[in-house]
């Protein structure tokens, strides 16, 4: 049964996050998805991001809305970018263009430890109405909503 890793800060659960999470569950099939959620300690420089527990609750609510059984996933705290993927046995890692370099680093570390590399599943960005990627930063700035719809005209 496949073990699939996916990770992120998940500040604003937007359509890009949805695509990543859905892909992870699709690949897992009868296996399990391990969702690494960035810890407060890792984000200590960015005070505009909600605390770990609030982000965790929103993530749990989102997965519950997907009607995924609790035994099919586990949320783990990420205290570093690689999390448990360098030590534990996983089969896949689902990444965005932003997190792809981390997956390459994880596989280099795994190779040095004599572990099999993870199969990297690359998920493209989801684009907003204006053709640029949906991101939590853009949502926080009030440019777009979580579905990529424009909220106001961009300041040129």
Swiss-Prot record:
<comment type="function">
    <text>Reversibly transfers an adenylyl group from ATP to 4'-phosphopantetheine, yielding dephospho-CoA (dPCoA) and pyrophosphate.</text>
</comment>
<dbReference type="GO" id="GO:0005737">
    <property type="term" value="C:cytoplasm"/>
</dbReference>
<keyword id="KW-0963">Cytoplasm</keyword>
<dbReference type="Pfam" id="PF01467">
    <property type="entry name" value="CTP_transf_like"/>
</dbReference>
<keyword id="KW-0548">Nucleotidyltransferase</keyword>
<dbReference type="GO" id="GO:0004140">
    <property type="term" value="F:dephospho-CoA kinase activity"/>
</dbReference>
<dbReference type="GO" id="GO:0015937">
    <property type="term" value="P:coenzyme A biosynthetic process"/>
</dbReference>
<dbReference type="InterPro" id="IPR023540">
    <property type="entry name" value="PPAT_arch"/>
</dbReference>
<comment type="pathway">
    <text>Cofactor biosynthesis; coenzyme A biosynthesis.</text>
</comment>
<dbReference type="InterPro" id="IPR014729">
    <property type="entry name" value="Rossmann-like_a/b/a_fold"/>
</dbReference>
<comment type="similarity">
    <text>Belongs to the eukaryotic CoaD family.</text>
</comment>
<dbReference type="GO" id="GO:0005524">
    <property type="term" value="F:ATP binding"/>
</dbReference>
<keyword id="KW-0808">Transferase</keyword>
<dbReference type="GO" id="GO:0004595">
    <property type="term" value="F:pantetheine-phosphate adenylyltransferase activity"/>
</dbReference>
<protein>
    <recommendedName>
        <fullName>Phosphopantetheine adenylyltransferase</fullName>
        <ecNumber>2.7.7.3</ecNumber>
    </recommendedName>
</protein>
<dbReference type="InterPro" id="IPR004821">
    <property type="entry name" value="Cyt_trans-like"/>
</dbReference>
<keyword id="KW-0173">Coenzyme A biosynthesis</keyword>
<keyword id="KW-0067">ATP-binding</keyword>
<keyword id="KW-0547">Nucleotide-binding</keyword>
């Amino acid at each position: 049964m496949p073990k699939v890793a996916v990770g992120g800060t998940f500040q604003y659960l937007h359509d890009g996050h949805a695509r990543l999470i859905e892909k992870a569950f699709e690949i897992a099939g009868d296996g399990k998805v391990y969702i690494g959620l960035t810890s407060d300690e890792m984000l200590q420089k960015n005070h505009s991001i909600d605390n770990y527990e609030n982000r965790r609750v929103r993530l749990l609510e989102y997965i519950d809305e997907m009607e995924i059984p609790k035994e099919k996933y586990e949320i783990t705290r990420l205290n570093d970018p690689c999390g448990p993927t360098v030590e534990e046995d996983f089969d896949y890692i689902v990444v965005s263009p932003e997190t792809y370099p981390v997956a390459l680093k994880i596989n280099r570390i795994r190779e040095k430890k004599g572990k099999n590399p993870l199969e990297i599943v690359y998920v493209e960005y989801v684009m907003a109405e204006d053709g640029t990627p949906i991101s939590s930063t853009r949502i926080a700035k009030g440019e777009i909503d979580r579905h990529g719809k424009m909220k106001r005209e961009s300041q040129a």
